[in-house]
Amino acid sequence: MRDGDYRAANDVDLIISAGGDRGILDYFHKVVTDSAPVLGIYESDSTGFLAQLDVRDLEASLVRIDKGNFEIDQVFRIAVRVDGREVEPVLNDVAVFPSKSATLMEHVLRIDEKTVWRDNSDGLILSTPTGSTAYSMSAGGPMVLQKSQVFVVVSVNSLDNTRRPLIIPNDTTVEVADIVSRYHCEIVLDGGTRMGIKKSLQCSKHEVPAKLVRLSGNSSIISVIAKKVRLAEDLLSMPPSAKLLLKTLEYEGALSQRDLSTRTMLPERTVRLALRHLLTRGYVKKKTSLRDARQRIYELKL
């Protein structure tokens, strides 16, 4: 969509978003005002959480929508300010990490201007209930039902063994301040957009929710959580390299084998064996890169 199309997003009855969950996340980054409900579709060999409609079922589903056989879920977003500057809102999560992996980051967490902790960790994630089954969960956070009006705060791999994730009301203001690391730190919005940060991150509930079309009979948050629980049980028997690749793909999106080796600092042979394990288990799929037909990329199939 062009910028003008985004501004007219409330002048139509329905918006269809291709590209799976990433397409929906990108759309709601651009639209900060009220929008028509969004129907997300995904490729036939994948599944989605936000996008729950197989592209093969699109024609039949439009007939159901025309008859009014659908519901609209309103899910809240996070308003984000980086060093005092407002940036695009997020639907899943906002994370702050050092630009170099396996590097500690000092920070102070404040809620409604009151200091909750001072911590040294690999980073921090603030998620909505919608995002609680994404990167937040893989970092040790809880799974939260989508209609809950809460934020989830996770300090990733804290040096303090007693540090636990926080669940707080979403009418609070969350600030991550006094950020210090050996390397410059970055904000990551919904696992995609990155930008530098110097000192502080402020988050609050965005005044305009996202509207998502749900067709009756489609997978619910309960079934998604059940699938995530089965994955968590399977993770116990996975080699550490496979777990790391899963987390990296969830955080970074689709990557080539070489990219995975660079991001995780694992030898290419180890990455190759871990990918074979994940492909066999059905957690990852391999596809041809649209940028280079000779290159194969890997992405989650959850």
Question: What name fits each language-model region?
Answer:
Residues G253:
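Flexible coil/turn residues that form the inter-helical turn or adjacent wing/linker of helix-turn-helix
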Residues L235-A242, S256, K287-L302:
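Short, cationic-aromatic polyanion-contact patches
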Residues M1-A18, G23-I24, F28-T33, Q52-D73, ...:
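ATP/NTP phosphate-donor binding region
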Residues R118-D122, L126-T162:
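Gly/Ser/Thr-rich active-site loops/lids in small-molecule metabolic enzymes
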Residues D83, E88, V96, D112-V116, ...:
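ATP/nucleoside-binding phosphotransfer catalytic cores, i.e., glycine-rich phosphate-binding loops
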Residues S44-D122:
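Catalytic core of DAGKc-family lipid kinases
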Residues L279-S289:
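A short, conserved structural fragment
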